[in-house]
């Protein structure tokens, strides 16, 4: 069984080793997608150097977004009170792993690399996930809803500003946008609580900072 989808009980040492392996794979490695990339439906376009750099910057931002999603979900999983919620988070995390792999592949095709700050992005998101989980399951789901809604909005913006000929990147983001919206809806239906107004604003501010940095570094 895939490591991140396993729900059987482990010893503390086993759990630590599994978590360490998963973090290393997410932050420094290349997680394997369980589904083929949507980009495969389109040929790799010939982009100008300027367009290639721009597309790479956008895809690096989206790659970081998926790194953050992994951190958030697994931080929440670590302290989830109910097995049903834990399974819900793990299922969403698997789709996010596919997104991460697709973005990584596209970055490679664009002759670029992931953000150098991925360890920071992951660790800060993991701590946010733990914090959200400790508040209780309804609040934890509320963080999922807000995160996915914000991601959905920035994906829509990226779809509008990608180089017109970059159909491969565009199709990846289109599929991701659909699935992020579904994650938000599922969390909402599972009993998410609406976050108080200062929290979404703070999350949006942190996301803007991440985008500025990740576009270049």
From Swiss-Prot:
Chain sites annotated for binding Fe cation 2: 96, 148, 180, 183
GO process annotations (BP): ubiquinone biosynthetic process
CDD domains xref list: DMQH
Recorded metabolic or biological pathway in which this protein acts: Cofactor biosynthesis; ubiquinone biosynthesis
PANTHER family hit by this protein: 5-DEMETHOXYUBIQUINONE HYDROXYLASE, MITOCHONDRIAL (PTHR11237:SF4), COENZYME Q10 BIOSYNTHESIS PROTEIN 7 (PTHR11237)
Family the entry assigns: Belongs to the COQ7 family.
Protein name (record): 3-demethoxyubiquinol 3-hydroxylase
Organism: Xylella fastidiosa (strain 9a5c)
